[in-house]
Amino acid sequence: MRRALLTGIQCHACRNNVVRSFVSVSGVTFMPLASGSWSASQTRPPPLSRNFSSQHAKLFSSHPSDNAEVAVDPMPEKDITEETVKPPEEPEEHIPWYLQEELEATTSHPLRKQQPLPPLPENPPPILNGLLEHISIDLGLDDISLLDLRKLDPPPALGANLIMIFGTARGVKHLNVSADRLCRWLRTTYKLRPDADGLLGRNELKIKLRRKARRAKLAKSAKSTLTAPDDGITTGWICVDVGTVEGGQFRKPEEEARKVGFVGFGTFVQGTRIVVQLMTEEKREEVDLEGLWRRTLERNSLENEGLPQPQAEEPPQEAGDIHKPSSVTPAHISHRVSHAAQISVNYEQRRGISTGSRQNRDLEEDGLNYAPINPDGTIKLPELISESTPLTSLTSRLRNISPYEAIYHLGQDVNDTNSTTFLEQFYRKLSKAPDDLASAQRIKLICIAIMLHHPGYGKTDLFKVTQEHFISNYGVTPPQFLEILDALLSFKPDLTSDPPNLLLPAADMELALQTIDHVGLRGIDLLNSTVWMKLFVGASFRVPVCPVRDLMNAPVIGNRTPVSLDTYETVNRVQTRLLKVKTAAKIELSANEYLSLLRVLFDHEWYSMFWDTWEEIALAGMPRDKSLYVFLFQLHAESDGWEGWKSTLLNCIPMMERENPPVYMDRELAEVIARCLAIAHPEIMDRVERNEPSPLVRLWHRCRIAVEKEVPLRGAQNPPSTMS
């Protein structure tokens, strides 16, 4: 029965308890083994197998052995009595496993080690720490950063006491799922009402993806492709407005109320507003929203603390001029004036026949006297102004004279007020004029000097005077703003440096962008074609370029200047963003602005975008007249590298007569078309000599006939002079 009972119990603990119960009935007692009672010879136990077998043999034996008690030394009676006198200890209460409290894991999450959370700002709201941990650990967003915009004054459009969090999602699906879970978590945990702009719901995203797949399947069956630029799914950007939470306000309302002379409307914001910007990696790099707010915060902190604005890191090289400000006095300005650059009255860059060798000669060596020289060596110029000349007409007089004379009248530098008659009269009238008019006229004077590449007038000087004008709350008109922007974005490329200086310095562009920010706060329209075109041209190369990987060993390709591939791609990224702004804002360009855009695209070898813009002119309803076609062929005749698009260019020739009004070929058009033919088909002369019956040969003969005739064909107006 005992064996059957033991074999029927499978649990080892139960079997042990049953054995103990039977052993207690049989009279065998279990004595505790005292480690201190063993002798020195008994400290090492026998082998495990022998000990186990002998002990079990004695335990389950029915005949007690005589030496059964030898295994254990008897305890002294004194010790037994002491144990009996000692009160029994209360046994610890047994707690079942289902009632035991689980200890939280103290090990940190592996993502937290790889992606540390940004440090909390001063006086953070209580929700901020938990929100950051939820975004990083639970949602799995990367590259988390935090911007404290509570000190921004005036506050941003999103609200006062703003804290902005940025996070990068791994894809479009991860972006939508993370934003949806974040909103649900905020509603459930903190009872907030977040607003997510750009979020597609769970079912909405599935429906859109299903519809997109269905349209793609239908388009594939119809042997066509989907050409929709934006399907509304891949926005890559979701803005979650958490709302206003308690705590964390930067200024206390009672401190603001104690301000002396405080006048305003509205109420104080009790709490902090939190906004979470979730983007994909590509969208975050393209928008650079974090960098925009960071620069705005830095400029605002400097303004509020009364510190000077950030200037250009390098000494100002105005308009790309490589000359440094000189300390030459007007008495010795004759040599400096002789080397000034020739600039047209409207300050536009024009291409023409180079006469640099003649312009760079000294006045004495060339024998040309632009102005009489006094016996003491100074330039004797006619009086530019008189006592009766009004202040508003003084700066306009500088535009009506040659650049050499204008540079002389402007004196040594921006601090010069009396070295010339013009400056003496100008600042004398300036002291008697109203403050706003005086500030505007001084800005205009510095703008003219910068456009003339005067070495003593810098763009930082113009920015400083403009900031004083803004701080004084003087009015700014759109023409005045455009004049300031032209001066800040003016640049003269230097092809003699190593490497060539072909781009506007980043410091000059930063000054222009800061001016645009200030003007935008005054209500002036910035999303127009004029401002956009100036920024687009200012961020581009000013000469035809070609990208190369090895700039040191790059060969010369026609008239194109080699530039490094990294610089070329950086400029193209900026221009791509500006083109997206133009498309999103629906900016319409004028005819002259289209010409500037075409030139920049052609100089950058953006031939695909170039021809798309050419077609855009016709779609905009603008007539493509003779001047536009002359510009098109002249642009291709001056450069090369476009041979892959020669068929597209030659297809424009039959399109001329289909324009409204038609454009007929005359001598001017025939000359530039013939030059383009020679570049696109170098073997054209051999084919003409063989008199091949091809369209190219017929076009060449047509151009030859138009050139030989001294009058335009088919009644074209204004025939050009005969080509020798």
UniProtKB/Swiss-Prot annotation:
Paired cysteines (S-S): none
Gene name for this UniProt entry: ATP25
Membrane-topology annotation of the record: Peripheral membrane protein
Source organism of this protein record: Blastomyces gilchristii (strain SLH14081)
Sorted UniProt keywords: Membrane, Mitochondrion, Mitochondrion inner membrane, Transit peptide
GO terms classed as biological process: mitochondrial gene expression; mRNA stabilization
Superkingdom in the source lineage: Eukaryota
InterPro entries: Atp25, NT_sf
Compartment(s) of residence: Mitochondrion inner membrane
Function of the protein: Probable mitochondrial mRNA stabilization factor.
Protein name stated in the entry: ATPase synthesis protein 25, mitochondrial
Family: Belongs to the ATP25 family.
